[in-house]
Amino acid sequence: MAMNSTLFLEIKNEYTEHLVDVLTPYIYEGLLAIYSRACEIADESKKSNKILSIFQKLLQSIDEWNQSRIDDETNRIKMTGQTQEYLDDLVKAVIRSNIILLSCNNNISQAICQNFYNGLSTSALIHRCYAECGKDAHNNPYLFFHGVEPLDYKRNQVIIQDHVRMGITRAIRKILPISMILKEYLVNSMNLFPDPNRTNPLFPAQSINNAINNPFQLPSPMQMPGQPTQIVQPVQAVQSMQQFQPFQIEQPMGSQMMGFGTNITAPETKNQIEQEIFNVIKSENVGQNPQKIKAIMNIEKIITSAEPNQIADFAAKTTSARDPMNLPQANPIGFQNNQFNQQKKLYQHPQHNQYNQIGSQGQNRDYRQNNSNHSNNSNHSNHVDRTDRTNQSTYTNQTNLTNQSNRSNYSNNKNYYNSKSRTGDYSEINKNSKQGHFEQSQNYSKDTESMFITPANGQNKLGTGGNIDLEKIDFNNINLIEDYGVKHSHE
């Protein structure tokens, strides 16, 4: 076939679809006319329940139509669809395309065309279409029944039109001269595969053979215009590599010079940094907050180039200077989230969320004791206020005690009942004291005695006791809070 088979198949399908679209609505109208005739016959014979049976008998008579009735139906389709000019040619084009496609030979014999075209007419195809569509209607007569809901009736119309389209396609296939096509297909020789001796003008055989027999050869090395390529021999390349000398490092590279070129390990630089940091840390009042921030930023610019180990060592020195007990801190250098220029540092109470003050003498210790007395059995020490009660409570050196109607009010806003206390005088902690002296006030009850050891300025504001001689105090029996934990001593 000179024409592409795929393209020819598309042409055949387009012609066939066009013919089906033209004939489908008018074939459907013809079938409805046959159903209407069946309803009239049922009304005349007073057999309304036999409408579908009468309709099936009329469909069976389609094959017996005379030529005049077939011609009348053909003329009706041409005139109604306004296809009288090309309907005959469209039918011949559909038949011819099917014959050529099925025979796989465009040069079909003239005998088949002449004999078939002389006997083929449009009326014959339309008659065959009615016969095939009548068979589908005979098998499904209820689709034409009018005594149903409008929705069901419309659905039945769509189904009938689909059956008509399939019936027209079958009619075209059955009207083809299939016997003559098979003979032409079987008798005539067909070249399904191309002849190897036949040359293609686009790809000559000589060029194809040369490409197969001759291996692919790379072209000569590309050369730039006016700059010929120089091929270096391996021996010359090795000799040229020997000219390079190893790089001599005169001074070992390390972390001595970093950042902005400041030698952080120089003694004068270290002394300068330490002096500035200590001035900022130890100063009580440097100035306003912007001045403090500016001073810190100047220090930060100097030590940005320092190594982590050097910063850690330097931070340890500054931390030990500020904190004699060397407590753990979140930021040793103190650039962020730390309070500068304060000799008193606040530590959060682990239980009551309060704060204790650390004096300037480095006595950052919190004296406290957790005492419990069950059934007048109490644990006491030199700094414990012992009271008779039924519940266990914790006392600290920051608690302000009062006695109102034999009830004690503590700093955690809880009232404890003291049934045997005879005195209401207690000592109050002086939080603003910076002295290193201690004051002891003794309050006696019937069964117990209480004694507080609090940092004070030497005066007892609320208590009845006087000054205490520090030499008489047993400091070994006092429990201290270390590493944020409470240790208890029981006598």
From Swiss-Prot:
Residues 355-364, 390-404, 429-444 have a biased composition (Polar residues). Disulfide bonds: none annotated. It is found in: Virion. InterPro entries: DUF5764 (IPR043913). Keywords: Virion. Pfam families: DUF5764. Residues 355-444 are annotated as: Disordered. One of its GO terms (cellular component) is virion component. Residues 370-381, 405-421 have a biased composition (Low complexity). This is Uncharacterized protein L417.
